[in-house]
Structure formats: structure tokens, C-alpha cells
UniProtKB/Swiss-Prot annotation:
Gene Ontology BP terms: neuropeptide signaling pathway
Biological role stated in the UniProt entry: Myotropic peptide.
Name of the protein described by the UniProt record: Lom-AG-myotropin-2
Tissue specificity annotation: Male accessory glands.
The entry's keywords: Neuropeptide
């Protein structure tokens, strides 16, 4: 899990 959970949402980095 990164700052914006980019690894979980992929394209949705700003989620």
C-alpha cells in the first residue's frame, strides 16, 4: 500500500 494505494487501484492513483 502506497500513499495513494496505487498498487491496489492501479490507474486510480488519487483514490
Amino acid at each position: 500500500a502506497h500513499r495513494f494505494a496505487a498498487e491496489d487501484f492501479g490507474a486510480l492513483d488519487t483514490a
